[in-house]
């Protein structure tokens, strides 16, 4: 009888250990952070000389800037719709016209800015404006990041102070909140991020102008 009870207890204990191990494995799989990295070109919807456009920290779907001869340009149509409708393109004379209170400014493909680069380009049926030209006549901030694998340009109309936060330990910035979401980039401890939105367990942040969740 004692041997039988010992056998039964051993079986029960073994089953409990197996069940516990299985439950632990399931929980580990469930909460193990994903190490999958996104395809940068697919995520930003830009490659080569294309430049991903962000407006007030939101990626603009279907709109891309262009990197031309070391400078970043924005499509005139988008600039007109989003930030400044006063840039007028004279199709007949292939020139840009901008009307100020006391003068009218003209520019064509031969007009260059302080950088020595053309203020506008005509390519693929689109008129492209140099970012410095846009900021010269528009109350916006423009930052360009053109040395990474995917080029990005950030156009902001808000001048409000930004909420900053320090990253306390090595972390991953993800596409969405949740450990199973794909990783955009790794962030070392003591890095600084801009907090766009504070959620219950995650924050929507910008790091070196890469939009993500942390």
Region annotations inferred by a language model:
Residues 207-214:
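A short macromolecule-binding patch
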Residues 2-199:
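Primary recognition of N-terminal secretory signal peptides and signal-anchoring hydrophobic helices
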Residues 200-204:
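Short aromatic-glycine-enriched beta-strand elements
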């Amino acid at each position: 009888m004692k041997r039988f009870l010992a056998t039964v207890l051993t079986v029960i204990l073994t089953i409990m250990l197996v069940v516990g191990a299985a439950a632990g494995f399931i929980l580990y799989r469930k909460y193990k952070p994903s190490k999958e990295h996104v395809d940068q070109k697919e995520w930003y919807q830009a490659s080569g000389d294309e430049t991903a456009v962000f407006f007030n920290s939101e990626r603009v779907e279907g709109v891309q800037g262009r990197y031309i001869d070391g400078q970043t340009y924005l499509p005139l149509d988008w600039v007109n719709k989003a930030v400044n409708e006063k840039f007028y393109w004279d199709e007949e004379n292939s020139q840009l016209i901008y009307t100020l209170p006391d003068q009218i400014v003209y520019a064509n493909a031969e007009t260059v800015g302080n950088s020595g680069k053309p203020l506008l380009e005509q390519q693929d049926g689109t008129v492209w404006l140099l970012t410095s030209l846009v900021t010269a006549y528009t109350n916006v901030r423009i930052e360009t990041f053109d040395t990474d694998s995917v080029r990005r340009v950030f156009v902001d109309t808000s001048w409000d102070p930004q909420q900053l936060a320090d990253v306390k330990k090595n972390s991953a910035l993800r596409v969405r909140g949740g450990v199973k979401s794909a990783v955009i980039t790794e962030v070392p401890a003591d890095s600084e991020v801009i907090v766009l939105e504070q959620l219950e367990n995650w924050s929507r942040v910008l790091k070196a102008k890469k939009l993500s969740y942390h």
